[in-house]
Curated annotation (Swiss-Prot):
Organism this protein belongs to: Tabanus yao
Residues that make up the propeptide removed upon maturation: 25-38
UniProt keyword terms in alphabetical order: Cleavage on pair of basic residues, Secreted, Signal
Protein name: Tabimmunregulin 12
Keyword Secreted assigned: yes
Amino acid sequence: MLFKSYVYFLAGLLLVGLFTSCDADAQYEELVPGFFRKGGVSGVGDYKPIVVFGKSFNQFEAAEGAKG
C-alpha cells in the first residue's frame, strides 16, 4: 500500500514537471498580454492627467482634492 502511494506521488510529480516551465515570465506574459509592456501594476506607461473643470490634475492631486 505504501509503495503504491509512493508510485502515485512520483507519477504526479512527473506530470506537474511536464506541464510547468522554469521560464515563468513568458507564461505570465502570455496570460496577461501587454501587462508587462505597459509598466505593470503602477501603470506608468499609461499616465494621463485628469481634467476637472478645465484644470489638469495628476491622480495624486485629484485624490487629495477629493479628501478636503
